């Protein structure tokens, strides 16, 4: 669907997900992440970039596992994560939009839990490339976890946490030969409606991840 069509449907409150493609498993157990290897940090930083042309090939499960762990997985026995959050609130959740459905990443169990058995990729971004890329990450703040943070500061703190997560994804993509782009121009109301979010949850950002499109 074109960008203009999405914007028009969004203005009318009619931007809706498509039916799921394939079987929607209620949960997906991810393989243990490979936390060793990769390219040196300085090299990953030199290769970090935003790309907007994606192959349609789905990411193998081990790659998805490593990606989500790098983004915001648990890296310490005490439950610490790979990205910081103010007062360790860990208020940002990662929703994974796949052709078969939208899933919530559970870092404690390192698995995905089905949220809605629909293809949300049309909804998760205005850009036309989002529809066909195999994976979109949606970052959502859950402010019920922010009781120690002043109300007027919660949104800013959540965006800082989400920004750190997106940079982790960028660096993993650079290290793994993937393409990614972070997007703030999204229909937050349509995404929240499609995922059935509660009033205390706020859609922050969306990030497409895929193999880069090969041009001939």
PLM feature segments, named:
Residues 1-133:
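N-terminal amphipathic, basic helical "cap/leader" segment at the start of enzyme domains
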Residues 48, 67, 94, 135-191:
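Small-aliphatic-rich amphipathic alpha-helix that forms the alpha element of a beta-alpha
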Residues 4, 32-34, 202-216:
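C-terminal helix-cap and adjacent tail motif
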Residues 99-100, 142, 212:
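Solvent-exposed coil/turn segments that connect beta secondary-structure elements
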Residues 82, 87-88, 186-193:
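Beta-rich nucleic-acid/ligand-interaction surfaces
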Residues 191-206:
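Short, electropositive alpha-helical surface patch
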Residues 86, 180-183, 199:
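Short, surface-exposed helix-loop/turn micro-motifs enriched in polar/charged residues
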Residues 25-27, 153-155, 204-205, 210-212:
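A short, structure-level motif marking secondary-structure boundaries and short turns
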